[in-house]
Amino acid sequence: MKLKKTVVTTVVVAAMTVLAGCQSVPEARQQSVIEQLSSVSMLRQDNIAGAYEVAVAPGVDSVFVAAVPAFEPNSGGVVQRLDPRSLQVVQSIQLPRRSFALGFNPTSSTLYVGNTLDGSLTVIDATNGAVRGMIQLGERVVDGKGQVSAPHTRKVVVDPLRNQIFVTSPDSEGLVWIVDGATNKVRHTVETNGPWPAGAAFDRANNRLYVGQGGLNEVVVINPENGEIVNTLSTGDTTSADPKESKHFFVNMAIDEKNQRLFAADANTGSVYVFDLGNGKVVQIVPVGEGLLDIAYSEQRNEILATNRGVSRGSPAGTGSLTVIDGTNYSVNRRVDLPVHPNSVALSANGQTAYVTVKVPHGNDHPAWRKDAQDSIVRIDLQGG
């Protein structure tokens, strides 16, 4: 099968910068440029320092990006609100703690920000960007040098129907916190009996949380009502209880609720594992590439979208892409090159548009490294071919 391959350049539309800084340009002309950008099938803006996860919030006509501009002690985070059409930053929400993960409740218009290094959630009113509060999930400990540590958070998944939030904590003995969105209190703390619980996907109809990790049972199934593990799924490939012997690490997951399929992004092998939730068996393995990271499922298109960073310890100089997989036969429909390192992917409510954050190289040993380069947000019309 011949794949269609699309290359996205890192060039930011110069007209946007000119219009933003030149007050003499007529407003009508500026609006015309914005409308033109809104209609293109693919748009990239290199305008975010330290971008991580992206979330789409159609109820407030916004795309949010969690960002960590700096990692110095006591540095904070930023959540950038973007126009979903032009990808222009329309609001910057400063936070006292660094922001990595995002979960959105469309019913209450509440944005939950995962403060990974602090073991907490910041609660934001998505209608105006006001910070409503902070939920401390893991105990913060101060050592003799005054350094603060806490169990890290990872994925934030929201169930708007029951107003509950799920947060994974990837440690050698991992946890999942289940939070009541009405009270902002932790209802249950679940031990997953496995290392590094990271990815998570929620089945709304059956009220079941699927959590991906390493170890013997790469997926645990949790009943949020009582916080109990009711089932586990395994590839059967790992035979030792030693976490170092884990063959897989399901770093992110997505679910097809209608057809009861679970898609797991395996960071160890660079492949997507497809589980039949009816029998708990792996029905397909789809190779994607090195540095496989995030995954999303478009029910409307019956397509699986996966980002891979394109690098590994053995191949540190690569670049990544977004892979679009056919949900019927699991063939690759399309690869979209997104240099340098694609990170998080989220879908519009109608499943026809993808938003992807793309990170610059971490160090100057990468050939694409440039001083003061900014991370990016990319909008892709999946109907555009």
Where are these regions (language model features)?
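Predominantly soluble domains enriched in secretory-pathway, periplasmic, or organellar proteins
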Residues: V18-G385
